[in-house]
Structures are given as C-alpha cells and as structure tokens.
Amino acid sequence: MNIDIVISADHIDEKGLINKTVIIIDILRATSVITTAINNGCKKVIPVLTVEEAKDIAKNSEEDIILGGERNALKIDGFNFSNSPLEYTKKYVEGKTVVLSTTNGTRAINNSFNAKTILISALINSKATAKAIDKLHEDLIIINSGTNGQFSIDDFICSGYLIDCLYNIRKDLELSDIAKTAHYIYTNNKDIESFVKKATHYSRLKSLNLEKDLEYCFQKDIIDVVPQYKDGYIIKSNI
C-alpha cells in the first residue's frame, strides 16, 4: 500500500486523486465535528463551500436542517452551531441533517471529489479509520486540510498517528518522504497536544477560550465510527 500526504486544501491535485482512497483530516475542528455528529446519530452531513450555499439548502430543504460552521474560527451569523464538536450532541443532531461550512475542512472535502473513496478522520477515530483503510487494499492519499492554505502541524502529526495505526495492522506500507516524516514526528512526539501547543491554529483557538474543544479534539480513538463522503453527503461508512 502506497501512502502519500497532501499538506493543505490548496495543494490538492484533483486529477491525482482519481481511483485513489482519500482521507480528509482537519482535527481542529471540522473532521472532529463531522465524526462526532455522525457518531451521535446525525443522519448526514452536507459539506459546502459558502455560507450562501448552506443557507439555500436549509431554506429549500424539507428535512430537519442544522446549520454549522465557522469563519476565522468564529460562529457564522445566522447558523445554529459553530465548529465546536461539543455542540453536536445526540440531543441536537440525532436524525437530523447538518449542513457544514468551514474555512479549511469542507474545502478540502469539496476539492477531493475525484477520489474513488473519501473517508473522514481525526484523532478521535484514527484506529477505526485504519481498520477501514485496511479493508480497501488501495493506495492512499492523506489530505491535511491545513490552515488557510498553509501547512498545519496538528493535521500533519495526526496523519503520522494514522500511519502508525496502519502499521499496527499491516507492515506492507510504502511511504512517500512526506509520509515518512509525519510518521517520524508522531513516533517521537506521542503526546500530540504538547507538541502542537505552539502551532498557529492551536494558539488561535486558545485565544478564543476554546480549551475544551482542544482537549476533546486531542483525545485518541474515543469513537469507533468512520464517516464517508458519498453522492453528495457524509454518512456513516459501512466499510
């Protein structure tokens, strides 16, 4: 199995994704939100690029819609929820559709539509993601959503942890140089939050008093669910 990493949503080569399995990572916080919502019984998540698109879907849909997302880490005016995974509890999302628009994560998803399979991962479900990947027997591209088109330490070290989880299942991994680097960084910094504390995006969230979000997002493997993008929606994968 060949594994490569893309460092941000802006670095995605859409043609290069054809017939590939893609893993989208945005641990702070979009993929943590999606994984949490699906785990709490959300019917589906619709990832969109713009605020206007999200509001149009909510206006024209007959389904029970929750609008969620952020711009510059802040809740969007007129939306039900921000990009905090702690808001997407079973009480509020069970049986409902979440329309999500974020600065980085939903853009990475929308830029990956050429892929054969798109799975959603974060620290909170990395082991479950690794098990699903193992069943697919396909080359893998891990896409880090990044921060405003730039490299993001938090997504990168999460990629390293996901690779480590895969190594615990199978040994026939062929890593690109960047994938080797991510794995090396993780294996030498297994206390991920401590390593990430000086990162730009981490500091931004902390400045907004989102310490509880950070604490939640840096937990490993508290969820055994893998969301999958399919036919316009993100649902619970049956892989």
UniProtKB/Swiss-Prot annotation:
Q: What is its EC number?
A: 3.1.3.71
Where does the signal sequence lie?
A: none
Q: Known PANTHER family for this protein?
A: 2-PHOSPHOSULFOLACTATE PHOSPHATASE-RELATED (PTHR37311:SF1)
Name the source organism. Clostridium botulinum (strain ATCC 19397 / Type A)
At the top of the EC hierarchy, this enzyme's class is hydrolase
Alphabetic keyword roster: Hydrolase, Magnesium
Q: Please list the cofactors this protein needs.
A: Mg(2+)
What Pfam families does the annotation carry?
Answer: 2-ph_phosp
Catalytic activity, per the record?
A: (2R)-O-phospho-3-sulfolactate + H2O = (2R)-3-sulfolactate + phosphate
Task: Supply the gene name.
Answer: comB
Keyword Cytoplasm assigned? no
The protein's matches in SUPFAM superfamilies, at most eight in alphabetical order, are given as: ComB-like
Family stated for the protein in its record: Belongs to the ComB family.
Molecular-function GO term, any one: 2-phosphosulfolactate phosphatase activity
Q: What is this protein called?
A: Probable 2-phosphosulfolactate phosphatase
Q: Does the keyword Transmembrane helix apply?
A: no
